[in-house]
């Protein structure tokens, strides 16, 4: 289901992010859009790229897709944002590695007149014009509910949060912890 809806969401995302860039439409020049994500190798991001590539022709978009080699390299993302600013991008579609450490670069892009749309993983910036993502607190609660569907009398929980720098990682853990909090069987919660 997610793979079928994603191209539609990305087409809408492209249209929304380019609102206000009418000057390029009149001249026939393509919109310059950068898609800067957390990774270019996972199946999730490959499906996002497929949707963006499907929509770019319809919306006359010159699309540059960039992402670091690891999902921890927020500085590479910041450099890609600076590259988009230097290149005169009209819009950036962005998924933050760090909610806080990517904020200044996004603020700089917005100050340069670039429309910024966040997908999947948010950034602490007022310069973002649209956000598309999951209700991560609710997703965490749903995971907790599934984890509690056991007949065990005592439960010790270990949380491995590999996205602790991202807002979505923090919110998922928050929702998971909240979902566990009402069950007396939960004895201890460890986070690594």
Roles of regions detected by a PLM:
Residues 4-23:
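Sec-dependent N-terminal signal peptides of Gram-positive bacterial secreted proteins and lipoproteins
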Residues 21-192:
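A residue-level marker of the well-folded mature domains of exported/periplasmic proteins
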């Amino acid at each position: 289901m997610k793979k079928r809806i994603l191209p539609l969401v990305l087409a809408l995302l492209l249209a929304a992010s380019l609102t206000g860039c009418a000057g390029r439409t009149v001249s026939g020049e393509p919109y310059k859009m950068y898609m800067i994500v957390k990774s270019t190798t996972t199946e999730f991001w490959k499906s996002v790229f497929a949707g963006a590539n499907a929509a770019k022709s319809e919306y006359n978009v010159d699309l540059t897709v960039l992402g670091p080699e690891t999902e921890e390299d927020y500085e590479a993302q910041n450099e890609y944002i600076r590259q988009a600013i230097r290149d005169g991008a009209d819009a950036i579609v962005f998924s933050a590695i760090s909610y806080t450490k990517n904020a200044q670069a996004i603020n700089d892009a917005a100050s340069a007149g670039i429309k910024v749309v966040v997908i999947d993983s948010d950034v602490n910036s007022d310069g973002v014009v649209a956000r598309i993502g999951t209700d991560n607190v609710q997703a965490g609660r749903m995971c907790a509910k599934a984890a509690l569907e056991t007949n065990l009398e005592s439960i010790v929980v270990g949380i491995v949060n590999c996205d602790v720098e991202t807002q979505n990682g923090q919110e998922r853990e928050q929702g998971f912890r909240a979902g566990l909090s009402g069950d007396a069987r939960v004895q201890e919660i460890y986070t690594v």
